[in-house]
């Protein structure tokens, strides 16, 4: 549901600040229409493809957490921007088990947990680093084989097993809706994630709240908010259209 041509490149701090304010206003309005408190929804600016020096402008515009898909790109930016106080990183893309050490070293949260093996690798590396990590389990709600995430019916077993990993703080679920102009098909993905989260909450291990729903991007976040999103991942509507096609970051 994204027409990237409608997102002009933000080139100054003021343009970024204005885009952030515009998106926040749209989030607030979507919450009001849904009868929700706007404070329930967090805006996660997604900075993939943009170089570290450009992200200094985003920091100056008010960004204090940035989302990245590719771990090597994220890790390099973290190293280059370590001088920026209180800047946190959220890794939202698929992660290979052998790259868990990088996430454990610097990320504040990870939105794409999709296997017990990856959870174990993260927990081991976090123990070495003496850190903790907020994680969300990625669910494939579209049924598309090309998308990452576990099938919804696998979620109860994985959630139950995650309780053994003391360095992981399981916060909720994440999904990518299908890439479709059919708004109701997109909505169906979000409804499915919310209903799954609600069903899991009643049987979640002690201390596991499962309050977060990470769903919705630049083209569909208002639908996601109407269906219960607590984190919306916004890139192009803040920073401008990306040169790389979505297929570079998300499987088709």
How would you label these PLM feature ranges?
Residues 229-250:
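Gly/Pro- and small hydrophobic-enriched strand-loop and loop-to-helix capping segments
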């Amino acid at each position: 549901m994204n027409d990237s041509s409608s997102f002009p490149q933000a080139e100054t701090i003021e343009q970024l600040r204005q885009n952030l304010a515009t998106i926040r206003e749209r989030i607030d309005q979507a919450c009001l229409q849904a009868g929700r408190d706007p404070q329930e929804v967090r805006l996660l600016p997604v900075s993939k493809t943009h170089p570290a020096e450009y992200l200094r402008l985003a920091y100056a515009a008010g960004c204090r957490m940035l989302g990245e898909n590719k771990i090597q790109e994220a890790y390099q930016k973290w190293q280059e921007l370590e001088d920026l106080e209180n800047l946190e990183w959220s890794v939202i893309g698929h992660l290979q088990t052998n790259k868990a050490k990088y996430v454990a070293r610097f990320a504040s949260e990870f939105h794409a947990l999709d296997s017990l093996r990856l959870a174990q690798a993260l927990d081991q590396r976090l123990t070495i680093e003496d850190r903790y990590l907020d994680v969300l389990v990625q669910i494939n709600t579209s049924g598309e084989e090309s998308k990452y995430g576990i099938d919804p019916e696998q979620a109860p077993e994985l959630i139950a097993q995650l309780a053994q990993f003391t360095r992981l703080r399981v916060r909720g679920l994440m999904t990518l809706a299908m890439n479709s102009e059919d708004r109701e098909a997109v909505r169906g993905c979000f409804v499915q994630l919310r209903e799954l989260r609600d069903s899991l909450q009643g049987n979640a291990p002690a201390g596991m709240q499962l309050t977060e729903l990470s769903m919705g991007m630049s083209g569909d976040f208002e639908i996601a908010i109407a269906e219960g999103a607590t984190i919306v991942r916004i890139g192009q509507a803040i920073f401008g259209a990306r040169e790389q096609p979505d297929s570079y970051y998300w499987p088709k």
